[in-house]
Amino acid sequence: LQSSSAASDVYKRQGDNWSFQCCGPHPAGAPDSININMMGWQPDGSDDGGQYYYDLALAVNPYDANIIHVGGVNHWISYDNGLTFSCPAKWSEPHKKGYVHADIHDINYFGNDLWFACDGGIFYSDNSGDSIYKKQFGIAGTDFWGFGTGFVDGEIMLGGTYHNGTLLKDGNTYLNDWLCTDGGDNIRGFVNFGNPRIA
C-alpha cells in the first residue's frame, strides 16, 4: 500500500517485479470498473479522491494468502490474491453484516480473529470478514463536541460527536439510551427551549 499527496495505490508482487494493481488516478488513470479506487467513498470504487492520507490499512490472512483486506473509508476484501476486490458494505450501511464504520486506520489478524480499528471504534470478525461485529459496547469512547438539552425537561438531549454522528437521548427510550439520528461529524445539538420535545 502506498500513499502520498499525489497517489494512493495498491501494488502486488508477481515474481521478481512489483506491478500496479488498482486504486486511484496515478499511475493507472481515472477510476473505473477495473481500476477501482479503494480509498474513496463509493462501494464500487468509482469516485475520484478519498482519504488515503488519513485512512490506510492492509492485512493478509495468515492461513490463506488469497484473502487480503484493504481499509480506507470503506473495507475492501479480495479472495483471489488481490486480482479483484469488493466492498461488502459501504461506510454508511450499518445494517449490512459486513459493515465497518468509516475511516479504517488499522486491520490486524490475531490467529483466526480479524480486528478493525476505525473512527467508530473496534470491529471484529471470526470468519475473515464474512460477518463483522461491533465490539465497542460498554466502552465510553464517544467524543461530544457540543450538545443541547431541554430547559425545562432534562430528559431530551441532542449532541454532536466526533465521527460518530448526531446522538439523541430521550430518557431511557432507546437501546443503550441513545439513538444516532445522522452520521458523520456534528459540532452541536439544539433542543427547543419552548418545547423540549423538539430537538
What are the roles of these predicted feature ranges?
Residues 61-63, 110, 150, 192:
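Structural WD40 beta-propeller signal
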Residues 38-59, 101-108, 185-186:
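Signature of short aromatic-glycine-proline-rich micro-motifs recurring in repeat-based ectodomains
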Residues 19-49, 89-98:
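Surface-exposed loop and turn segments in beta-propeller and other repeat-based domains
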Residues 68-71, 115-117, 157-160, 199:
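Conserved beta-strand element within WD40/beta-propeller blades
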Residues 48-49, 97-98, 136-139, 180-183:
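Surface loop/turn motifs at the tips and blade-to-blade linkers of beta-strand repeat domains
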Residues 65-66, 112, 154-155, 195-197:
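Short coil/turn segments that connect the beta-strands within blades of beta-propeller domains
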Residues 13-16, 80-83, 126-130, 171-174:
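Short loop/turn segments that connect beta-strands within beta-propeller blades
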